[in-house]
Amino acid sequence: IEISKKSYIKWCGINDTRHISVILNNKVTLHNFYVPAGGDVPDTESNVKFAHKIAFLKEMISYFKEDKTKKKILVGDLNIAPYENDVWSHRQLLNVVSHTPIETENLKKLLNDGNWVDIMRKFIPLEEKVFSWWSYRNRDWKKSNRGRRLDHVWLSEDLLSSAKKMIVYKEARDWEKPSDHVPVVLEIDL
């Protein structure tokens, strides 16, 4: 597929290239994001990294609320596991960065206000646990399975029928020198 236009936005006034987008020749806009991780302390007053993460999300919400583009895809490491079954223990992670109420509420607002569909949850029901990230600190990641779903693929509703298959490639976590994230792959017929 040829690319007709590419761009990025300075989110929060910082030129840290956390976003890139392309418009494909078939008029589909593809956005790729890396949302700030947010540091270790889930408090916007005492942790500037967490404050930046929340500000970044709010800016994304404003942007996509105004964006009336049809045929769009959003992918990336959003560093938030929004639903109870996107983490190994909802109760134990409520005060851990990536699953706090302020993060999950803002991500769900972004999803709703931007008219996105969380396509992974169309293929894997909310009742099922699904993870795309496991800590490097846990050597026996499979046995403990203390993961989180931080990597996302969202579609505009007009592309839903194009989505054919979704794969979370957990096997990649066993590769030599793996990432702590595994690929999430959407097969889509554009």
Residue ranges of predicted features:
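Structured beta-strand-rich core segments of catalytic domains in phosphoester-bond hydrolases
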Residues: 1-40
